Design a protein with these regions (language model features):
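Tryptophan-centric aromatic hotspots in well-structured domains and transmembrane helices
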Residues: 3, 38, 70-72
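General structural signal for secondary-structure boundaries
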Residues: 3-4, 30, 120
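Short, low-complexity N-terminal intrinsically disordered segments enriched in polar/charged residues
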Residues: 1-13, 17, 140-150
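Short, charged low-complexity linear motifs
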Residues: 1-2, 24, 58, 89
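A solvent-exposed, acidic/Ser-Thr-rich amphipathic alpha-helical stretch
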Residues: 8-68
Length: 150
């Protein structure tokens, strides 16, 4: 799959121009923002020292003409801390009449992710809305900078 191969251009092409993406770190509107997120994440994952930690497993893929769902487990180094993460994700999708992704919602345990990605701060504060807001704010800022770089 494009995701397993870290191919953000193909991933972005799967989304409708006005698609929406939401997870614990991002809330995005439009193919440009969503594609930018995938480019940013794939670029970080492909860096020397990080690429050998990347692994994606997926299962439970179900879809019809209007909606779908998938379960995946992503193994990677979190670029901000260099810590190993094993994120367990359940995604739901809706599709446009021409088969593009209209909405994409990923759900995962933020506290579990924070413990792995951030270490002690995530363990102590991963349950708190304030840490989640901080992570979302940082992710949005990083994406804005990444998109500005072209």
């Amino acid at each position: 799959t494009a995701f397993a191969q870290l191919d953000p251009a193909t991933m972005a092409a799967c989304y409708a121009p006005d698609a929406r993406f939401d997870d614990e770190a991002f809330s995005l509107k439009g193919r440009e923002q969503i594609g930018g997120m995938w480019r940013m994440l794939c670029t970080a994952t492909q860096k020397p020292g990080a690429a050998e930690h990347w692994k994606l497993e997926f299962s439970g893929i179900e879809a019809d003409a209007t909606a779908g769902k998938a379960h995946w487990e992503a193994h990677y180094l979190f670029s901000a801390t260099g810590r190993q993460v094993h994120n367990i994700i359940d995604g739901t999708f809706t599709f446009t009449p021409d088969g593009l992704i209209a909405t994409h919602r990923d759900r995962f345990s933020f506290w579990r992710w924070a413990r792995q990605a951030l270490g002690a701060p995530g363990l102590l504060l991963g349950w708190s809305p304030s840490l989640k807001r901080k992570v979302r704010s940082t992710a949005a800022g990083n994406l804005k900078k990444f998109l500005a770089q072209g």
